[in-house]
């Protein structure tokens, strides 16, 4: 029972997504997690990065204020928050699939006999089609939310960090005395990683948009095929009609003899048998 339930969940989950949504989007999400776990902690480590942020001043509190102005939000925490937000719509969609499968599972358990199944077959088919339509629109909605989140993340990353990390930063905030020059460690490495994460986010945005376009084209194609007159043509039905057509050119004539005529014909004696 558990195996069939899991197969049903997997079938419902893979019914509407195209290969882009089924393979590429999860792969890019996994790539983000690997990049953050393998490289992000080493490149943008919180304690080490702040300790390597050097300012030409001995004024108390100046270095902390300048570092806060340079990095209002740590890039590593920003990307972790972004991945969490992007994964929320997919998690909600999976929860909706589980609810849909459990609801249909309980409804099918209520059907006890074959007669009830046959009598309710049409209603069950309508309910299944309605459920499939709800799953499709739920999938489209979660793709739309993901598209908005990816676009907001790209804009936020560009606003906070730009495309490259500068090697120096001029700070003019209190309690610093005048302008203070501060220097960042490994700016080239940080710039490369920043552009990599920007590119991965851009690919996720592009593939999410492509998935929506493919879903729209697929739905339009199904509607066009359903309305097309040629789709109603069936060679089997046409051949069946030809086989069942009456043969008017060769009518069948049925001749019946009357009982009286049959008796008279049987009572006649041939001429050769007469004396």
Curated annotation (Swiss-Prot):
Main location class: membrane
Pfam families the record matches: Connexin
Amino acid composition bias (Basic and acidic residues), ranges on this chain: 254-267
Positions in the Extracellular compartment: 44-77, 156-196
Regions that span the bilayer: 23-43, 78-98, 135-155, 197-217
Annotated membrane topology: Multi-pass membrane protein
Biological processes, Gene Ontology terms: cell-cell signaling
An annotated Gene Ontology molecular function: gap junction channel activity
Subunit annotation: A connexon is composed of a hexamer of connexins.
PANTHER family assigned: CONNEXIN, GAP JUNCTION GAMMA-3 PROTEIN
Family stated for the protein in its record: Belongs to the connexin family. Gamma-type subfamily.
Name assigned to this protein: Gap junction gamma-3 protein
Organism encoding this protein: Bos taurus
């Amino acid at each position: 029972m558990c195996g069939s339930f899991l197969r049903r969940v997997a079938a419902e989950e893979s019914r509407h997504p195209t290969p882009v949504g089924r393979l590429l989007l999860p792969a890019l999400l996994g790539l983000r997690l690997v990049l953050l776990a393998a490289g992000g902690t080493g490149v943008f480590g919180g304690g080490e990065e702040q300790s390597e942020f050097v300012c030409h001043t001995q004024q108390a509190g100046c270095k902390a204020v300048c570092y806060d102005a340079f990095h209002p939000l740590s890039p590593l925490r920003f990307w972790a928050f972004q991945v969490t937000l992007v994964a929320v719509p997919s998690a909600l969609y999976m929860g909706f699939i589980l609810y849909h499968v459990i609801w249909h599972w309980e409804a099918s358990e209520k059907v006890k006999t074959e007669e009830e199944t046959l009598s309710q077959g049409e209603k069950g088919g309508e309910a299944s089609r309605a459920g499939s339509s709800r799953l499709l629109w739920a999938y489209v909605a979660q793709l739309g939310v993901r598209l908005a989140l990816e676009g907001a993340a790209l804009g936020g990353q560009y606003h906070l960090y730009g495309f490259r990390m500068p090697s120096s930063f001029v700070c003019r905030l209190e309690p610093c005395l005048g302008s203070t020059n501060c220097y960042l460690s490994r700016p080239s490495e940080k710039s490369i990683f920043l552009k990599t994460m920007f590119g991965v986010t851009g690919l996720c945005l592009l593939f999410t948009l492509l998935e929506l376009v493919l879903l729209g084209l697929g739905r339009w194609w199904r509607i066009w095929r359903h309305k097309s007159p040629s789709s109603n043509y069936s060679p089997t039905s046409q051949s069946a009609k030809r086989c069942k057509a009456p043969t008017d050119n060769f009518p069948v004539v049925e001749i019946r003899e009357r009982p009286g005529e049959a008796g008279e014909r049987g009572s006649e004696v041939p001429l050769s048998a007469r004396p």
